[in-house]
Amino acid sequence: MRVLAIDWGEKYIGLAISDPLRIIAQGLDVWEIKDEEDFVNRLKKLIKEYNVSEIVLGYPISLRGHENEKTKKIEYVAERIKTVVNLPIKFVDERFTTMEAERVLLEGDIKRRDRKLLKNKQAAVIILQKYLDSLSLDTKI
């Protein structure tokens, strides 16, 4: 069973998926946001295709740790997802993930126009890896 991460941007949604053992995150796709119905239908198909058992959403709290309009939007997205799929949804603090994603893409020598599109996918990878790492810290050997 895999974990799916979603980085909800202004125009694009970045997606990342874990391996079946929930150790490694990898970028999956970038979707342009058209409308809610399109998003929900594509999400249901993706969940089935990858055997997803849990969803992680980047949670955009302010630098001081306060909620804002973006956090309300993500909470709404989570509630919308819950109406169509019966999976646990977790929030992960996404502060600085966009900056880190841009740095990774710059270091990878990705062209500027491609970076703009790939930024959300890379941010989703970072969010998911943070979550997976937190799971491994909870596991006792």
UniProtKB/Swiss-Prot annotation:
Quote the function comment for this protein: Could be a nuclease involved in processing of the 5'-end of pre-16S rRNA.
NCBIfam families annotated for this entry?
Answer: RNAse_H_YqgF
What is the name listed in the Swiss-Prot or TrEMBL entry for this protein? Putative pre-16S rRNA nuclease
Going by the entry's taxonomy, the superkingdom of the source organism is recorded as Bacteria
Q: Name one Pfam family in it.
A: RuvX
What's one GO BP annotation on this UniProt entry? rRNA 5'-end processing
Kindly give the SUPFAM superfamilies that the UniProt entry links to this protein.
Answer: Ribonuclease H-like (SSF53098)
Question: GO cellular-component terms in the record?
Answer: cytoplasm
Can you say where in the cell this protein is located?
Answer: Cytoplasm
Report the main location listed first in the record.
Answer: cytoplasm
Organism of derivation: Dictyoglomus turgidum (strain DSM 6724 / Z-1310)
